[in-house]
């Protein structure tokens, strides 16, 4: 291929589904003959929301909710056409966001 590297960035709320998706990508890429670097765990983005429990008063009574976004980075170096075809046909679990840069 003309491009020397494919960078895949994965995001998910659950780290187990993220790790299974990363494992499938690495397995398919190595099976087709490409060199793989990763999966590299990136920093986890944490969103914290504080909400007042009561509707009108009692501001001291609050509840906190948290949402974590886990991220992984995979580099596929010197991909072949078989590698690209295998990645296009790959079925990943739902809930995993995939960003691909060539």
Curated annotation (Swiss-Prot):
InterPro entries (UniProt xref): Ribosomal_uS10 (IPR001848), Ribosomal_uS10_dom (IPR027486), Ribosomal_uS10_dom_sf (IPR036838)
Stored SUPFAM superfamilies: Ribosomal protein S10 (SSF54999)
Domain of life: Bacteria
CC terms in the record's Gene Ontology section: ribonucleoprotein complex; ribosome
UniProt keyword list: Ribonucleoprotein, Ribosomal protein
Keyword Repeat applies: no
UniProt record, GO biological process: translation
Record-level Gene Ontology MF annotations: structural constituent of ribosome; tRNA binding
SMART domains: Ribosomal_S10
Its job: Involved in the binding of tRNA to the ribosomes.
Subunit-level organization: Part of the 30S ribosomal subunit.
Family stated for the protein in its record: Belongs to the universal ribosomal protein uS10 family.
Protein's name in the database: Small ribosomal subunit protein uS10
